[in-house]
Amino acid sequence: MADSLITLMIDGVPVSVAPGTLVIEAAKQAGVLVPHYCYHPGLPVAGVCRMCLVEIEKAPKLQIACATAVTEGMVVKTQSAPAKDARKSVLEFLLINHPLDCPICDQAGEGELQDFVFQEGRSGTRYGEYAKRFNPVEDFGPDVLYVPNRCILCTRCVRFMDDVAQEPVLNVSERGDRAFIGIHPEARLDHPWAGNVVDLCPVGSLLSKDFLHKARAWELDKTASICTGCSQGCSITLDTRDEVVVRVRPRPNLDVNRYFICDHGRANYRWMNRGDRIEAPLVKRDGELHATDWDEAFARVLGILRGASGKAVALVSAGASVEALSLAKRLLSTFQWTGAFQVVMGEEAPLAGVPNLALRAERAPNAKGAEQLGYTRDYAAAVKAAESAAVVLVLDDPDCPVQTAGALIYAGTVLPPETACRAAQVVLPIANVAEEEGTFVNRDGRAQQYFQAKPAPGMARPAAWVLGELAAALGVAEVA
């Protein structure tokens, strides 16, 4: 493998990369970030912004790092005087028309133009305010606004819709200093993956209506997580402000979702902030549920489990973590247990330009993990079996239509409706996916970890902690 690598020097640092690697990517391995706007590793190369100009020894002129492949023995200088002067000039041209509205721009603190102006740009401009443009904001789609005054025509959005989404509704209209991003007059940016143009935009020209004016970038806490919208298992970042999830963004994962997420997953966070959460354990007294502490709730559950025998049924959510599902199985291991999960189905929406990436019809982030642990998809049969079971455990499935002659234990984030699990003897408050650490297994069998982004409300705890404490107190051994 090492024999097939190409070795070059970038700012005096030797780097070995695979043949065909672009200079801009090789520079990253040397710890050098070459400024760029039009280039994105998930899009076809355009080479239109000219911001990534570097000096290459023996080349007759400066080269763009985003479209130049490495060669053996190449010597690249990203910080030479000619390269830096050229990038300063490019930035000066880009800023001729760009408005100075960083204080009101939603992308302030995250804008690549802002970053590279500080890193590479001149301290002043030779052009007056007369050069600024004043064009109205356009409504491109259900969640996308276009602010043409900020656009630098990097064409990332056009290339995404053309080559990745393969729905060519955007274009560069007009020419020269009158050019702007246009949309087909009869089209809307309503493709199931259209929200990615907002993530791709380096200057705050394309904005999400959902996130508009919600927070500044420096106010956000960012946490690595896994999307719960379907069984694809896309890597995401949860952005929280004051312990409230305000935005979901894609996190690069070349094996699962590359650099993108669908709009369904992007909007799949509001339930994480629900205000009707269960904040304390509840136990049934005189036919009514009453708040209590964990000690009494655990004592009630342990009394039920120790006093029962025969069949037990676990009706679980396919959004529960591997850890929680494993501990639920362990907790019921002394019974003849049956476990099942329900899968909500929806419409599948593939991203045409990326193989094996789609919003899956199966809206179940951990269905594969549940199956690997012995839970089945025959939910109706399990609900039927629950009617005669000694113990029924419902895990985060508030709409479960269970009726049982035995004892019902419900662990969930919200209270079930009157027609579902209100017959429970004990209700255990648990954290949702944004409030715990855990593991999901996606449809391809890939186990992926997610992390806690905010605290759980009140006395709610992660399901794995609750079930683990009960299993330990019951003295049941781990099960395979």
Show the residue positions of the predicted features:
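Residues forming the flavin
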Residues: 2-11, 19, 25-26, 30, ...
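Short beta-alpha connecting loops at secondary-structure transitions
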Residues: 8-9, 72-79, 182-185, 222, ...
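Short, structural beta-strand-to-alpha-helix junction motif
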Residues: 21-25, 321, 462
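A basic, amphipathic helix-loop patch mediating RNA/tRNA/ribosome contacts
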Residues: 23-57
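Fe-S ferredoxin-like electron-transfer domains
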Residues: 50-228, 232-236, 241-245
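Cofactor-/ligand-binding subdomain signature composed of acidic, glycine-rich
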Residues: 128, 136, 241-310, 355, ...
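Non-catalytic alpha/beta scaffold blocks inside enzyme catalytic domains
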Residues: 307-308, 331, 335-480
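Gly/Ser/Thr-rich loops at beta-strand to alpha-helix junctions
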Residues: 313-324, 398-400
